């Protein structure tokens, strides 16, 4: 929790300059670097990664 107050972002992406305060946020961000769309609408062509 204190990382939020001090601005510490120890979890860094190895593909871009993104950094965050916890590993789960980094894991979510890493999906942006893939071409995998996990969630697709059954009624139209809409799809999203997360």
From Swiss-Prot:
Coarse class of the protein's main subcellular location = nucleus
Q: Which cysteines are joined by disulfide bonds?
A: none
Record-linked Pfam families: zf-C2H2_16 (PF23611)
Cellular component terms per the entry's GO annotation? nucleus
The record, for InterPro entries, names:
Znf-C2H2_CTCF, Znf_C2H2_sf, Znf_C2H2_type
**Single GO term (MF):** DNA binding
**C2H2-type zinc finger segments:** 1-5, 11-33, 39-50
Entry's PROSITE patterns? ZINC_FINGER_C2H2_1 (PS00028), ZINC_FINGER_C2H2_2 (PS50157)
Localization terms from the record: Nucleus
| Biological process terms in GO annotation | regulation of gene expression; segmentation
Q: What does this protein do?
A: Gap class segmentation protein that controls development of head structures.
Concerning its family, UniProt says: Belongs to the hunchback C2H2-type zinc-finger protein family.
What is the protein's name according to its record?
Answer: Protein hunchback
Q: Which gene encodes it?
A: hb
């Amino acid at each position: 929790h204190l990382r939020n107050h001090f601005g510490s972002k120890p979890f860094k992406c190895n593909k871009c300059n993104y950094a965050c305060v916890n590993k789960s946020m980094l894991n979510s961000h890493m999906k942006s670097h893939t071409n995998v769309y996990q969630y697709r609408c059954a009624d139209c062509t809409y799809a999203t990664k997360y």
